Amino acid sequence: EDKAPSVRVVVHETEADAGAVRLGRAIAAHVRACTCVVLGGDGTVHELLEGLFSDAQPRTISIVLVPVGTGNALYHALMGPDTAPDPAWRLGSLDAFTQAQAAKPLTLMQADPGHHLASVVVSHALHAAILRDSEALRAQYPGPERFQIAAEQHLTSWVHATLTLLPDEGHPVSVYDPSSRSFSRPAAYEHSPDGRVHVSGPFLYMNAMTVDRLEPSFVPAPFASPTAPAPLRRPARAMDVIVIRPTRQPSASSPDAFASDVLMPVLFQGMYQQGKHVDMQYEERRPIVEYFRASGYIWEPARDDALARTMCVDGTIVDCGERAIVRTTAHDVHVFCA
């Protein structure tokens, strides 16, 4: 008679901020390969991965994700935006695991300083400011409304920095052209001989993403979806970088006017409408949103701009100092999903 394979199950519970980092380190001290069933959200996955890969040893990690966190972007990106009243939608990854379906690889980003790992987003400017300030509001507003309150404080916050987009061997930096609906070499931008592309601020929005959405219906990077059309779909070792620079507007406007006339339509008629912002253009057909694809980037804040030094790595707020360097990694991480 066949016997079921022996499976050792260990249950852990995190108790404080960064508790999953300590848990990941403890697991890494004993195993080189494991399957982790995570009851949490993006922050828990982020912390767990940081702990698991805190040393230089290669590991093979599989994740079964049960989305019960504040932010569940990774789950919704892989399993769809369903948030029906029936909680069964939360069990898709677990069902895929129990049915022995193949797990899908994750693209991780490493953000320095700090060797932080992200499976969803590394951001600066607006998104980073919202995440930073929302923490101060958590006690008074424990629900998602604190993010809206924080956003209202920063809709007119332009940050000053220089962005350098990095190519990889065989994968040059590219930019989406809404006129042709394709990615191409960014010929109109300043280049270095090694293929780096230089973008000057000020910036209002700057997110590097390996998934398409940050909320079930909020889709800043639609081409990072595994279901995006094949010619537009993000390759495995790339990140999609979404940028809004206010001074690209043909007629100069104040931060208040830009927020009401440009940013709000981009957010609510674009990002909240399944990513339609990628095709929005000014009158002379200049894209409002710059949608880059790269293997990494360097972010260099202006010395006198404290907000520009704020970096968000899957919800963890980091002061990046004089420079942040972010690249995709080769870590072997898979998630079970249908």
What are these regions (language model features)?
Residues 1-39, 44-46, 50-57, 83:
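ATP/NTP phosphate-donor binding region
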Residues 49-52, 76-78, 219-220:
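Short amphipathic alpha-helical segments
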Residues 3, 15-26, 30, 90, ...:
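Eukaryotic beta-rich interaction modules
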Residues 1-7, 14, 29, 33, ...:
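Eukaryotic N-terminal targeting leaders
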Residues 57-211:
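Catalytic core of DAGKc-family lipid kinases
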Residues 53-54, 135-136, 222-226:
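Short, solvent-exposed amphipathic alpha-helical segments in soluble enzyme
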Residues 20, 45-46, 214-216, 320:
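Short, well-ordered alpha-helical microsegments
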Residues 198, 216-338:
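ATP/nucleoside-binding phosphotransfer catalytic cores, i.e., glycine-rich phosphate-binding loops
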